[in-house]
Regions:
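Short alpha-helix
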Residues: 64-79
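C-terminal helical/coil "lid" or tail adjacent to the Rossmann-like core of SAM-dependent
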Residues: 79, 84-137
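A conserved beta-strand element that flanks and buttresses the S-adenosyl-L-methionine
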Residues: 2
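Cationic, low-complexity basic patches in intrinsically disordered or flexible, solvent-exposed regions
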Residues: 165
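Core SAM-dependent methyltransferase catalytic element
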Residues: 79-81, 104-108, 147-162
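A short His-aromatic
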Residues: 8-10
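Conserved class I S-adenosyl-L-methionine
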Residues: 29-54
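A short glycine-rich, Lys/Arg-flanked "PGG" loop and its adjoining helix->strand segment in the class I
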Residues: 14-29
Length: 165
């Protein structure tokens, strides 16, 4: 089974891993990349500041789960997987335009908590906070992505046999 940029949207992770385990045959592989610990950290801090000034708790609104490699390894192993490799990889990613379209798409859970007339001004405030951190010298917005990549297998059943005398 393969997953790309989806698992961090699915809750609770234990139920997701249980579903993957049930879908795989013994010996099957589970390979994925998802948001990892500190993924979009600057963006989340800026959203938290802007929403906090409006009386909203960004942490409660967040649709994401960005675990560390150690935390997700523990969940994979608890679900019965053998982890072959797991790592957190920084992956700064250039955005095709400014941060505002990214926020409107991926930050809807945050901005959608605001009344409609407040969304664009809040989005602009977030962009103002992020500009010194996420815009490079050429003027390109760079999202501070951090990915969690892993390969895990569902072990084959232990061979069962009856010893012959």
């Amino acid at each position: 089974m393969f997953s790309n940029a989806a698992l961090h949207w699915m809750h609770p992770p234990e139920a997701v891993l249980d579903g993957v385990r049930r879908a795989l045959k013994r010996g099957g592989r589970f390979v994925a990349e998802m948001g990892g610990h500190n993924n979009t950290a600057a963006i989340i801090v800026a959203l938290s500041a802007v929403l906090g000034r409006r009386g909203l708790d960004a942490h409660r609104l967040s649709p994401w789960y960005f675990p560390s490699a150690a935390a997700y390894r523990e969940k994979l192993e608890a679900a019965g997987f053998t982890v072959e490799d797991i790592r957190v990889v920084p992956r700064p990613t250039a955005l095709p335009t400014s941060i505002e379209p990214w926020l409107e798409t991926f930050g809807e859970a945050f901005l959608g908590a605001l009344p409609e007339p407040d969304r664009a001004p809040a989005c602009a405030e977030v962009a103002d906070l992020l500009r010194p951190v996420l815009v490079d010298e050429s003027g390109t917005w760079i999202a501070d992505y951090v990915r969690l990549r892993f390969r895990a297998t569902l072990p084959p059943r232990a061979a069962s046999f009856i010893a012959q005398p």
